[in-house]
């Protein structure tokens, strides 16, 4: 055996086995980015008494996993690693598969993935899926593939165990995405690209120089054009930067990544390359330049910078306000197979933000009722959006209170009228409620008191 698993990895593995023992044939294992899920499924494949098919969604991940199997001295005589698209086109070329492992299972197209899983299930194979964020972009359920789910540690626990590093979160500016259209669960790329003005590039470069000039950073951009522009802006500022995307030739990509690992390149800008499982060492800072409505994508991007190293603290510079949509990297999240994740609440019940940004040092922190920034200790002034929501809440409370008071007044009036025993009682009721003496006279006469 080439791999020694950690306690939490063994617990996840045991949990999956327990579900299989109950009769489930398809189990989804959830483990936060950086939790070492690839080591878990490599151990599974190594122990399988039959042929194992490992499915990935990109050829780069296939090559990476094959390399990891070899590096850990795991024989691959009965292990096949292939993209789900390739397997879908020639499913009959893979006979006698006993176990199917699906890495980054939430990223597979539902129809293609289901066809592949159903094919091998008919042959008697069982399926184990792995994901750090089991929610598809379009919000659709994953219960069409998996019948049960086993959860491993979340980000906060892995930070506590020193398996992920702590972080500092800065939000020097944000962008207004309220008017952006969505397509398949996320903002339309062309609209996001138009939103990202050159002024934002200048600000992120200034903040990088101020906060983490010695750290190597990865920048997540919204398009190839955007990524290239950001790399050019960093280079013009005297900071070695390079752009990568899925179309970058393999040899060129390997050369640039080697230069990054060697410290020759300080900033790697990319589009969807390092946010989907592909790993790269040496990242000390994450630059968020792509607003996203996808929690899964946001978690993957944050996770690239949280790989553990002694004394490392990752710097996250969020220039697009993703924290306001998705919270902080180590927030606890409730996952279900239905793809529904409890949405991050921007406001507390009192109208204040659940996550605040200090306007002085730009640090982002959880709102625990502090009157000042826990980092720079400047007094925290309520944001205009907080004040607006607080005012709306107060107006609602006033309205509700007025309605309740009026209902109580009417109930008391009804009771007083019922208990009136003489004309004088009606004149007293009129006085208390601001009614005229004519009202009292009429009521008393109706009762026969006058």
Regions from the language model: what does each represent?
Residues 62-68, 228-232, 239-271:
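Conserved helicase ATPase core of P-loop NTP-dependent helicases/translocases
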Residues 62-96:
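Inter-Walker segment of RecA-like/P-loop motor cores
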Residues 149-221:
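Conserved interdomain linker/interface between the two RecA-like ATPase lobes of SF2 helicase motors
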Residues 107-169:
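Post-DEXD/H (motif II) to motif III coupling segment of the RecA-like Helicase ATP-binding lobe
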Residues 106, 246-250, 257-332:
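Conserved RecA-like P-loop NTPase helicase motor core
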Residues 57-61, 82-89, 110, 222-225, ...:
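Conserved helicase motor
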Residues 22-44:
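Walker A/P-loop
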Residues 1-28:
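Conserved pre-motif I regulatory segment
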């Amino acid at each position: 055996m080439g791999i020694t698993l950690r306690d939490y990895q063994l617990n996840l593995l045991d949990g999956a086995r327990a579900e299989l023992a109950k009769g489930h044939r398809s189990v989804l294992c959830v483990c936060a980015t950086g939790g070492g899920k690839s080591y878990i499924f490599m151990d599974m494949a190594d122990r399988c008494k039959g042929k194992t098919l490992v499915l990935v969604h990109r050829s780069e991940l296939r090559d990476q996993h094959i390399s990891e199997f070899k590096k850990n001295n795991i024989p691959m005589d009965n292990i096949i690693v292939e993209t789900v698209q390739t397997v879908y086109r020639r499913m009959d070329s893979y006979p006698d598969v006993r176990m199917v492992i699906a890495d980054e299972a939430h990223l597979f197209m539902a129809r293609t993935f289901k066809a592949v899983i159903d094919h091998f299930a008919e042959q008697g194979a069982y399926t184990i899926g792995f994901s750090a964020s089991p929610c598809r972009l379009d919000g659709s359920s994953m219960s069409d593939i998996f019948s049960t789910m086993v959860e491993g540690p979340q980000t906060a626990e892995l930070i506590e165990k020193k398996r992920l590093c702590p972080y500092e979160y800065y939000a020097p500016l944000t962008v207004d995405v309220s008017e952006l259209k969505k397509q398949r669960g996320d903002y339309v790329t062309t609209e996001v690209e138009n939103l990202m003005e050159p002024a934002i590039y200048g600000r992120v470069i200034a903040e990088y120089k101020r906060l983490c000039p010695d750290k190597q950073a990865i920048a997540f951009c919204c398009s190839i054009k955007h990524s290239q522009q950001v790399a050019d802006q960093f280079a013009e500022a005297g900071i070695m930067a390079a752009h990568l995307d899925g179309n970058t030739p393999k040899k060129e990509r390997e050369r640039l990544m080697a230069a990054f690992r060697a410290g020759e390149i300080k900033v790697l800008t990319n589009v969807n390359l390092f946010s989907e499982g592909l790993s790269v060492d040496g990242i000390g800072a994450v630059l968020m330049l792509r607003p996203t409505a996808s929690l899964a994508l946001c978690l993957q991007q944050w996770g690239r910078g949280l790989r553990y190293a002694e004394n490392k603290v990752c710097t996250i510079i969020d220039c697009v306000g993703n924290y306001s949509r998705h919270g902080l990297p180590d927030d606890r999240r409730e996952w279900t197979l239905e793809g529904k994740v409890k949405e991050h609440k921007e406001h507390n019940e009192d109208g204040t933000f659940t996550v605040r940004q200090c306007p002085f040092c730009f640090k982002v922190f959880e709102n625990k009722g502090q009157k000042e920034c826990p980092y720079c200790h400047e007094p925290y002034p309520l944001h205009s959006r907080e004040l607006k929501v607080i005012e709306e809440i107060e107006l609602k409370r006033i309205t509700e209170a007025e309605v309740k008071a009026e209902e109580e007044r009417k109930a008391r009036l009804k009771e007083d009228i019922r208990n009136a025993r003489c004309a004088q009682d009606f004149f007293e009721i009129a006085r208390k409620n601001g009614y005229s003496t004519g009202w009292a006279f009429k009521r008393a006469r109706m009762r026969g008191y006058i």
